[in-house]
């Protein structure tokens, strides 16, 4: 069995190139296909190619980096075993690599980790320890155990050999198509982007390498703006595979030097990209797996790119099946094919008919209403559009010219997650209430902790929860606080769940507030 050679602390590009060429990743990983997306290529007037890392034995690229590092361990290190912390694809990569190398592995995963992920790691032969409420607590425990018991820590991204292992993907890309114009790569901790960029710039520097981040987890963008890695105050939950608060030090150094550009996208755009992948190549990508395609589509539109050969990395397909319901609901918005509007119309006979006639025959995709006032009615309406933002603006102008008050909710996350399912729940009298959105761990006892901390001191006047198949759920709750708001803030801090005050959200005022 080949052994990779150790790299220096901050290797230069040529040293990374040699490490990529020597990385013995194919003892565990596979060369994955580069496949043309015929339908999308025709639609976007470019040749769109997808690198199918979902075809790896662990259904993600993470196997490359994990094996590259672990294959280079000394016999003494292998005898002591390895440890890592992960709730996702890195855990499976380490477990699979350990089985191939005959090395004991311990994977520390947060207690809220979905059973499907825990079972997958165990299925590859890894020992699992469930510890902590989140990744940071799991990581702290893993590092503690590494120091106490002599395990070797296998980082998910910020290590030269992990980066070199991910760089083998770029070498395959160039061998499969040497005429690429641009390559789009997803970014979480930066290992894949760093490995791809440094390899391509050593061999074919004319190819542009563009990083893609989720808007709510853009740690690389924040680091580039600051000039050094920084901690994000919070990260999004939807594209959990790239939900990293801080870019790695070495990955940042390489990304800063070798990347050509960076772009961010929202969750709706990711959902639309997931649909594109399914319709074109029948791949069911996880959200972070479709991130690069979402960024590519946005980049093409922003820069009016035509006639180029563009590749993107489908980085993983470890999707929770129940999360696909959420994707299906949101992809129309991501494709700019649906407008969500709050419209005030007269509470009188014939007003619905007049409103629909003013839409000019456009298809209504959603219509939510409940009587609440004798004078005016507030309706939540979805309208199918075919020309994106321009048509949405045209509809709003038509409605305003027709005498209606209109608020565009198409980009309002709270409206899309919660309010659309709650229209008609306005209280009969004004309430002194504050509205908050929460992120709950999907684990036994989470709701009980919430109620023990907050529900016994203040009346809960509104509550909405819907599972989206991720490790965390989204909850919308309102409380009658009266004169006890300072005490409530203290209790929120004790609760420890991520939360945001939504009391001034227009969707709340239109449809739910007393």
UniProtKB/Swiss-Prot annotation:
The pathway that the record names for this protein is: Amino-acid biosynthesis; L-isoleucine biosynthesis; 2-oxobutanoate from L-threonine: step 1/1
Q: Which cofactor does it need?
A: pyridoxal 5'-phosphate
Binding of pyridoxal 5'-phosphate occurs at 89, 188-192, 315
Alphabetized GO MF terms: pyridoxal phosphate binding; threonine deaminase activity
Residues bearing N6-(pyridoxal phosphate)lysine are 62
Q: Which domain of life is it from?
A: Bacteria
Q: How is its activity regulated?
A: Isoleucine allosterically inhibits whereas valine allosterically activates this enzyme.
Does Oxidoreductase show up as a keyword for this record? no
Question: What is catalysed by this protein?
Answer: L-threonine = 2-oxobutanoate + NH4(+)
In the record, biological process GO terms are:
isoleucine biosynthetic process; threonine metabolic process
Q: Which InterPro entries match?
A: ACT-like_dom_sf, Ser/Thr_Dehydratase, Ser/Thr_deHydtase_PyrdxlP-BS, TD_ACT-like, TD_ACT-like_sf, Thr_deHydtase_biosynth, TrpB-like_PALP, TrpB-like_PALP_sf
EC number of this enzyme: 4.3.1.19
| Oligomeric form and interacting partners | Homotetramer.
Role noted for this protein: Catalyzes the anaerobic formation of alpha-ketobutyrate and ammonia from threonine in a two-step reaction. The first step involved a dehydration of threonine and a production of enamine intermediates (aminocrotonate), which tautomerizes to its imine form (iminobutyrate). Both intermediates are unstable and short-lived. The second step is the nonenzymatic hydrolysis of the enamine/imine intermediates to form 2-ketobutyrate and free ammonia. In the low water environment of the cell, the second step is accelerated by RidA.
Know the name of this protein? Answer: L-Threonine dehydratase biosynthetic IlvA
Query: Gene name?
Result: ilvA
């Amino acid at each position: 069995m080949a052994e990779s050679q150790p790299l220096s602390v901050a290797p230069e590009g040529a040293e990374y190139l040699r490490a990529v060429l020597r990385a013995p990743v194919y003892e565990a990983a596979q060369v994955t296909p580069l496949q043309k997306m015929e339908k999308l290529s025709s639609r976007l007037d470019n040749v769109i190619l997808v690198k199918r890392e979902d075809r790896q034995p662990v259904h993600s690229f993470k196997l490359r980096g994990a094996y590259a590092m672990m294959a280079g361990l000394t016999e003494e290190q292998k005898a002591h075993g390895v440890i890592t912390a992960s709730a996702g694809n890195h855990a499976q990569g380490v477990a699979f690599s350990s089985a191939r190398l005959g090395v004991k592995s311990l994977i520390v995963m947060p207690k809220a980790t979905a059973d499907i992920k825990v079972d997958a790691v165990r299925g590859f032969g890894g020992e699992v320890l469930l510890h902590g409420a989140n990744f940071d607590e799991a990581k702290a425990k893993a590092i503690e155990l590494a120091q106490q018991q002599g395990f070797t820590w296998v980082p998910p991204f910020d290590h030269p050999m992990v980066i070199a292992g991910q760089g083998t993907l770029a070498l395959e890309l160039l061998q499969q198509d040497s005429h690429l114009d641009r390559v789009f790569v997803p970014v979480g901790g930066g290992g894949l982007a760093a490995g791809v960029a440094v390899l391509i710039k050593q061999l074919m520097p004319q190819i542009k390498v563009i990083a893609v981040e989720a808007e709510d987890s853009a740690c690389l963008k924040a680091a580039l703006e600051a000039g050094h890695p920084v901690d994000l105050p919070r990260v999004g939950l939807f594209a959990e595979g790239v939900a990293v608060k801080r870019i790695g030090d070495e990955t940042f150094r390489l990304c800063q030097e070798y990347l050509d550009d960076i772009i961010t996208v929202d969750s709706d755009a990711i959902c639309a990209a997931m649909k594109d992948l399914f319709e074109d190549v029948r791949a069911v990508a996880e959200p972070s797996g479709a991130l690069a395609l979402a960024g590519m589509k946005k980049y093409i539109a922003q820069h009016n790119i035509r006639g180029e050969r563009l590749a993107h990395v489908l980085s993983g397909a470890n999707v929770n099946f129940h999360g696909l319901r959420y994707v299906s609901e949101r992809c129309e918005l991501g494709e700019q094919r649906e407008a969500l509007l709050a419209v005030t119309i007269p509470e009188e006979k014939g007003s619905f008919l007049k409103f629909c006639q003013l839409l000019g025959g456009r298809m209504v995709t959603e219509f939510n209403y409940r009587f609440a006032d004798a004078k005016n009615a507030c309706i939540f309406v979805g309208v199918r559009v075919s020309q994106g933002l321009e048509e949405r603006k045209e509809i709003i102008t038509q409605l305003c010219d027709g005498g209606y008050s209109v608020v565009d909710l198409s980009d309002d996350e709270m409206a899309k997650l919660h309010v659309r399912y709650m229209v008609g729940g306005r209280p009969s009298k004004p309430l002194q209430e504050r509205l908050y959105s929460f992120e709950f761990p999907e684990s036994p006892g989470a709701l009980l902790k919430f109620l023990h901390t907050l529900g016994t001191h203040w009346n809960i006047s509104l509550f909405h929860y819907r599972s989206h198949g991720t490790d965390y759920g989204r909850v919308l709750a309102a409380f009658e606080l009266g004169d006890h708001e300072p005490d409530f803030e203290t209790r929120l801090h004790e609760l420890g769940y991520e939360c945001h005050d939504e009391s001034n959200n227009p969707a709340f005022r239109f449809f739910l507030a007393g």
